[in-house]
Amino acid sequence: MVKFKLNGRDVEIEEGRTLINYLREECDLTSVKNGCGEGACGACMVLVDGKATKACILKSDKIEGKEIQTVEGLSDRDKKVFAYAFSKAGAVQCGFCIPGMVISAKALLLKTLNPTLDEVKKALMGNICRCTGYVKIEKAVLMAAEILRENRDVPTVFCKGIVGEEMGRIDAEDKILAEGEYVDDMKINGMIYGFALRSKYPRALVK
């Protein structure tokens, strides 16, 4: 068995097991998304000793004695700051990739609270987003850095719903902090699973 720390607690995992499988199936940590399964998209990003790392290609034998942190394990302060910044910047659309973006942002801000735009872009190079075009995500990271750097309180947002008022998405915080459910995150007692069975003979005539 391999022993390591997960969000501050001691855990152990079988040797040779993929970290993402353990985090999602055993720990119900759904911020770690299975987007590609081959280390390309960054939706499964976690912190390993403070470094952004893709959990879908990380085997348990590589994490002995290390500290693993997911979005669920971030401090309340960090959660509030990232939730505000990503929502305020309009950086959330479908939201699937955002927890991974938050982890990459956190890894950067552990190094510096005064990053340049180029440093933000470099930090997010391992994360793919098909919705936003990255500009608003980069803005969100810079905004989060500023709040943390200046030790400012997170502004409280009140929306009256009047015409012309700037309003945030009602589901933004849930998506940023991985509290919103996607289909693969759902678990129901007695759930039946299925998958598409592809024919080995695409031109075969079935009679």
What is each of the regions a protein language model found here?
Residues M1-P155:
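Signature of N-terminal electron-transfer/Fe-S-associated modules in redox systems
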Residues A145-K207:
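Flexible, low-hydrophobicity surface segments
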